[in-house]
Each structure stands twice: as C-alpha cells, then as structure tokens.
Regions:
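Two-component/phosphorelay signaling modules centered on CheY-like receiver
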Residues: 21-39
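Acidic catalytic/metal-coordinating carboxylates
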Residues: 43, 69-72
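Non-catalytic signal-transmission and effector/linker regions of two-component phosphorelay proteins
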Residues: 1-21, 28, 116-134
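Alpha4 helix (beta4-alpha4-beta5 surface) of REC/receiver domains from two-component response regulators
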Residues: 72, 92-107, 120
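A Lys-centered signature of the CheY-like receiver
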Residues: 111
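Short amphipathic alpha-helix used as the core "switch/output" element in two-component signaling
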Residues: 49, 71-82, 122
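Acidic, metal-coordinating helix/loop segments flanking the phosphotransfer/catalytic sites
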Residues: 40-58, 98
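Active-site residues of response regulator receiver
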Residues: 62, 89
Length: 134
C-alpha cells in the first residue's frame, strides 16, 4: 500500500498489538497509509519483545490477548519508554475503561474501530511525542 502524504503531520513509531489477524492487517495497513512506521505483535510475549528492541511513540492494542492482558504490556512499556497507549476493545463499560486507565492506557476506543477517531487520537498525541515530520 502506498504511503499517503499528510503535510505537517508527525510520523509516529507505533506498535499494534492485536491477536485477530484480519484486524491487525487492516490496522497496520491503514496506519502505514497515514504515514506512520508500524510494528505488529499478536500476543503479550511478542509485544514485550518489540518493546525491548525498539522505541515507540504509541501502542495501539486490543486488551484481551491469547497469552494474557495488554495491561501487562502497557505497564512494562510505560516503565521502559515515554509513549502513549491506546486501548482498542469491544468492552466499553466504565469498569473496563477504568481498568485500562489504571494500567496506563491514555485512550480507550471501542470496536468496531472508528478509524477517523483513531486518526484524531494519533494526531493529538503526535506533537507530544518524538515523531518526525512526514
């Protein structure tokens, strides 16, 4: 997929953590199209390996993963790096949002994914992170 040019927008290093293959492919493709550099993991173990090896400006993650919770990933990520965490989940109840915030998620978006909303969130966090002009 060709990368779109959005003048003045920051390029972010984003880790996408999503166990559903089709959703992961759509997310990585679209975020890459927006001009961001994307790494993708499908479980807690691979997400933690990425965090040990690379700096990220943001993590966009499903909460429920096959080998644990993304809350574990976010806690570790926030210990290691200054980044913004975006939860993507089908669970939008207050208790779920609170649990995500307690773990360190900065934003909580519900599925099905509203890509315009996700893009708006990323545009808001770009100036606060170390992205580069696209």
């Amino acid at each position: 997929m060709a990368t779109a040019s959005f003048p003045g927008l920051m390029t972010l290093q984003i880790l996408v953590v999503e166990d559903h293959g089709d959703t992961r492919r759509v997310l990585t493709g679209l975020l890459g199209h927006f001009g961001h550099s994307i790494s993708a993991a499908d479980n807690v173990e691979s997400a933690l390996a990425f965090l040990r090896a690379k700096h990220f400006d943001a993590i966009v993650s499903d909460l429920a993963l096959p080998d644990g919770s993304a809350c574990e990933v976010i806690r570790e990520a926030k210990r290691r790096q200054h980044l913004t965490a975006v939860a993507l989940t089908a669970d939008g109840e207050d208790k779920d949002v609170r649990r995500g915030r307690d773990a360190g998620f900065d934003y909580h978006l519900t599925k099905p994914i509203d890509f315009a909303q996700l893009r708006t969130v990323l545009e808001q966090i770009a100036p606060a992170n170390s992205g580069r002009l696209a």
